[in-house]
């Protein structure tokens, strides 16, 4: 695998209009959940969306989208991502969803219980290959991908340097920073924001995840942890605060229901998400990102 520093944008991204990274200062803040729901929201808004899961230590997105048994295919042009949702119909007012595809190391390691015990050079080489060799398109007709979300490892490491080097010429829109309300999480987020400044990634905004708990019985939201840490950090650093996302047990149930026998119609997460309490919250967060109107890459 090639480990040399690139001098141009990866050709695999030439079919992608917008690139957004999802970053977190530390693990366990629900970054992959935010990535999943951001993708679902974009699809429901009619955008053809791709998700690149390069969190090599915990590639959980195949499980989140209910496609962990699917296989990645190799074409003459490169790896073909797994189709999570294919609208397959002409868009209209009643049917405006986009398509959704996913590429993840989880498809390549076979056993979901296997751990990835790799040294830094092998990790960075795999990340470079993911960014250069995946053939992104918005469906079977090779239409452009409107948005590519890149779910990154937590913290700042060699993997992040490799990501920054590969995307140096790709002109990404920027990064969404995910934190939880606690001070220990927001302190690490400062490091992530400093990293973005050093590698010239715009910070699109901060999301405070796990901000409260939605009762599954009465739907009332209770602050079981501290709250407001993400908003306070945003104000101090003059960044846009995108919103609070509470813990919603129903979303976890929807993820698990995809493989459940009770799911008679075998609904995908895209369909199940219509009934999620978090849907409206995520629409507000995504709208704030879209309102920034970053120009398309082509």
UniProtKB/Swiss-Prot annotation:
ATP binds at residues 25-32. The keyword Ion transport does not apply. It is found in: Cytoplasm. GO terms for molecular function: 4 iron, 4 sulfur cluster binding; ATP binding; ATP hydrolysis activity; ATP-dependent FeS chaperone activity; metal ion binding. It comes from the Eukaryota. Its cofactor is [4Fe-4S] cluster. [4Fe-4S] cluster binds at residues 215, 218. Coiled coil: none annotated. Gene3D superfamilies: P-loop containing nucleotide triphosphate hydrolases. GO terms for cellular component: cytosolic [4Fe-4S] assembly scaffold complex. Its main location: cytoplasm. It holds the Pfam family ParA. HAMAP family: Mrp_NBP35, NUBP2. Belongs to the Mrp/NBP35 ATP-binding proteins family. NUBP2/CFD1 subfamily. Heterotetramer of 2 NBP35 and 2 CFD1 chains. Component of the cytosolic iron-sulfur (Fe/S) protein assembly (CIA) machinery. Required for maturation of extramitochondrial Fe-S proteins. The NBP35-CFD1 heterotetramer forms a Fe-S scaffold complex, mediating the de novo assembly of an Fe-S cluster and its transfer to target apoproteins. Required for biogenesis and export of both ribosomal subunits, which may reflect a role in assembly of the Fe/S clusters in RLI1, a protein which performs rRNA processing and ribosome export. This is Cytosolic Fe-S cluster assembly factor CFD1. It comes from Debaryomyces hansenii (strain ATCC 36239 / CBS 767 / BCRC 21394 / JCM 1990 / NBRC 0083 / IGC 2968).
């Amino acid at each position: 695998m090639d480990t040399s520093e690139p001098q141009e944008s990866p050709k695999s991204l030439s079919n992608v209009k917008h690139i957004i990274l999802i970053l977190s200062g530390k693990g366990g803040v629900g970054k992959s959940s935010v990535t999943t729901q951001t993708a679902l929201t974009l699809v429901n808004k009619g955008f053809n969306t791709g998700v690149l899961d390069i969190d090599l230590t915990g590639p959980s997105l195949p499980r989140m989208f209910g496609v962990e048994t699917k296989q990645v295919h190799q074409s003459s042009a490169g790896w073909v991502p797994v189709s999570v949702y294919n609208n397959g119909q002409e868009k209209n007012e009643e049917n405006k969803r986009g398509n959704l595809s996913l590429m993840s190391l989880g498809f390549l390691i076979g056993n979901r219980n296997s751990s990835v015990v790799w040294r830094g050079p092998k990790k960075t080489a795999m990340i470079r290959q993911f960014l250069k060799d995946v053939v992104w398109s918005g469906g079977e007709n090779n239409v452009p991908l409107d948005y590519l979300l890149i779910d990154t490892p937590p913290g700042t490491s060699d993997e992040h340097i490799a990501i920054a080097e590969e995307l140096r010429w790709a002109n990404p829109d920027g990064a969404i920073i995910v934190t939880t309300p606690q001070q220990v999480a927001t302190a690490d987020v400062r490091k992530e924001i400093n990293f973005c400044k050093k590698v010239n990634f715009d910070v699109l905004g901060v999301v405070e995840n796990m901000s409260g708990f939605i009762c599954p019985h009465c739907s009332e939201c209770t602050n079981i942890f501290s709250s407001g840490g993400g908003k306070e950090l945003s104000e101090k650093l003059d960044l846009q605060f995108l919103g609070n996302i509470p813990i919603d047990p129903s979303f976890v149930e929807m993820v698990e229901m995809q493989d459940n026998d009770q799911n008679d119609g075998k609904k995908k997460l895209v369909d199940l998400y219509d009934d999620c309490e978090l849907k409206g919250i995520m629409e507000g967060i995504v709208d704030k990102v879209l309102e920034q109107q970053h120009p398309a890459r082509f």
